[in-house]
Amino acid sequence: MSDAEDSDSIVNEFVTAIVRESDKFAKVHSYPMQYGTGGYRADAELLSSVAFRTGVIASFLSAKLHGQPVGLMVTASHNASSENGLKIVNILSSLDSSKWEAYLDQVVNADSADELTVCLTSILKKAKIIPGSEARVFVGYDSRSTSEILAQAVIDGIVVCKAKYENFGLLTTPQLHYMVKASQTYGTPDAIGEPTERGYFEKLSKAYQSLMTGKKIKGTVLIDAANGVGAAKIKELAKYIDPKLFPIEIVNDNIDNPELLNNSCGADFVRTQQKPPNGISAPKHARCASFDGDADRIVYFAFGSHSFHLLDGDKICALFAQFLIDLIRSTGLDLQVGIVQTAYANGASTAFFQKTLKVPVLCVSPGLKHLYHAAQAYDVGVFFEANGHGTILVSHAALSKIISHEVLSPAQFNALKTLKTVFELINQTDGDAITNLLLVEVILAHKNCTLKEWNQLYSEIPSRLIRCEVEDRSIYTTTDAEQKLVTPEGLQEKIDALVAKYTGGRAFVRSSGTEDAVRVYAEASSRGESEDLALRIVELLH
């Protein structure tokens, strides 16, 4: 037998074992699933085969990366508790993501054993993966009733590939991102911490306490944890921090009843409904924050005398950017700060960055991989989506400058120490509601700033975001960072004609990356006009 024939035989035997095992996880979804910005999302009852097959591809990915760990998170984030999802963590951004997402879709949607065999064999050969190569997958899941079951299907997919796995159990999505990155870099100059939950909590608590020692804390922070995994993890973190430095009260923390997850609470509810979550009452101007179901998004809010004030991802981004620019200036360092947003960013925030802070702003398509990639263009990239998902990215070049920088005064020394510790506090691997909460609290304490003062950085242009169910979201294709429709043909021209009738009008339509729907976003000079513009665009979709 020739080497080629021997290789084919090994591949065939390997694939046959996978396909045979896959029979235990019958494909029940009748429509083509597509790996979107949030991975796969669907009714949980449809995801057993998807979980198994995604576990297989995660193993392939790790083998392609010479055994580097790949994360696989079971979560549907802010979606309803009856839904679930699967997302590969930390890796697709470093490879040709569109190619591997296409591989995933082919495998997940294969209808027969023969089709699955052809798909798997083709991927192994195209990617030049040798069956049985070293591979390792980290698995985590949220608090949904179906998550642990789906995680076991993932693990079965990993095991049949003869890959190693580590089941971290209940985690926030950002924690799994941290575990993967920490494991990849542990023991190297790029190490971010110990690749364990304890390592994560110790890293955050040490940095936070260092930054808050001697600072005045203004009252308790009320945290709406969306009845999700973030409730358990913020409570665990609090054990590592002096309670005088971290006065918190947690509501919507019932993770033992999965049906309550994201039910009239959580960051997505608060932002889209523009009202406080159930279960929370607070004094006027008290600091309140909402996480989403897997704790990668955060928004702040407060009760005014006669109104509700929302401080979304745009406002958090503004707070972070202003603080970092002032801090970097105080160190004497020459570092470029840049902002990355999506089309959902309020137009007033973009103007604040460009005209007040005088920093460059990039607009990219929604989704972590797009924001993360764009932020790498700067020494310090601050990227946020309006929904509260974002973080700060620091380049290797910037870190080298910080390490070698010679200070000329005690003030520069203190500023440099603070800057280094801020970069220790943030989770550069993913938007993280917990670390972003900590940094907001640090900045407000350092600036001796109230929520009301923070909210006055700029005044939002009135906007309206509407979720609209449609028969087929795939017909809505876009260009220009998803701000303009290409298809259905002629629809963009109709939207442009409507927008032109409104003072300060701006609007766009894009299909959701996480739900079977499209989203309509509109801005105009008044609340009523933005609402009217959005509703009139919705009429065009039906």
From Swiss-Prot:
Q: Where in the cell is it found?
A: Cytoplasm; Nucleus
Q: Which SUPFAM superfamilies is this protein grouped with? A: Phosphoglucomutase, C-terminal domain, Phosphoglucomutase, first 3 domains
Q: Which residues cross the membrane?
A: none
Which residues are reported to carry the modification Phosphoserine? S77, S82
Q: Which GO terms describe its molecular function?
A: metal ion binding; phosphoacetylglucosamine mutase activity
Q: Which residues bind Mg(2+)?
A: S77, D292, D294, D296
Its recorded name reads Phosphoacetylglucosamine mutase 2
Q: Which organism is it from?
A: Schizosaccharomyces pombe (strain 972 / ATCC 24843) (Fission yeast)
